Amino acid sequence: EYTCSKELLCKVSEMAHHYRTPVYAHISETEKEVEECKARYGMTPPMFLDSLGMFDYGGGGFHCVHVTDQDLDVFRRHHMYVITNPGSNTKLASGIAPIADYVRHKIPVAIGTDGPASNNCLDMFREMFLVTGLSKLLEKDAASMDAMEVLKMATVNGAKAMRLNRADILAKGKYADLIMIDLHQPNMQPIHN
């Protein structure tokens, strides 16, 4: 919202309706962005974009660091994905996304890296670690973020967020892109699950 005019956003919404397609946007990454949107339109970025019909066909929000309960309602109502980018948000001091809140509210979360201009290390293992670690810090609870849930965010949910329905799980007839990890290496120990 912060880099586009209302007129341009209305055109995006019109196109989304014409093609019946989801819209993905960087949303509520910084407090400044949220405050400026509220000053301009009297609403948070998710509420403003929703008022334009932007998410009538679903989609998602990148970052989603500074959100309200009403924003969560927008995400739920439109079956949107939140794509968290913890490395970028850490580098730019944007804040910590409330991932545990999204999980509690059954809003699907995927993990992204943003881009090289705002993240020096486009490494999904690092991003998974940051999702886990930062969530624990934010929640003040070492058990607040389940490792298997984070793995799902980085794999299944990422594929679903991109509508790669033929590459979301390992199954006959689906596409696969695999890596092998040697769990016997010292840095992989101990294994708890």
Locate each region found by the language model.
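Short, surface-exposed loop/helix-turn segments at secondary-structure junctions
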Residues: 186-193
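Short secondary-structure boundary/hinge segments and terminal tails
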Residues: 33-34, 92-93, 120-121, 191
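Nucleotide-sugar donor-binding loop of glycosyltransferases
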Residues: 27, 86, 182-184
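Short glycine-rich, flexible loops that bind phosphorylated cofactors or substrates
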Residues: 69, 90-91, 119, 188
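Histidine/acidic residue-rich metal-binding segments in metalloenzymes
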Residues: 1-81, 93-109, 129
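Short, acidic/turn-prone active-site loops that include or flank metal/cofactor-
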Residues: 29, 86-90, 115-117
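His/Asp/Glu-enriched, well-ordered alpha-helical/loop segment
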Residues: 51-58, 100-184
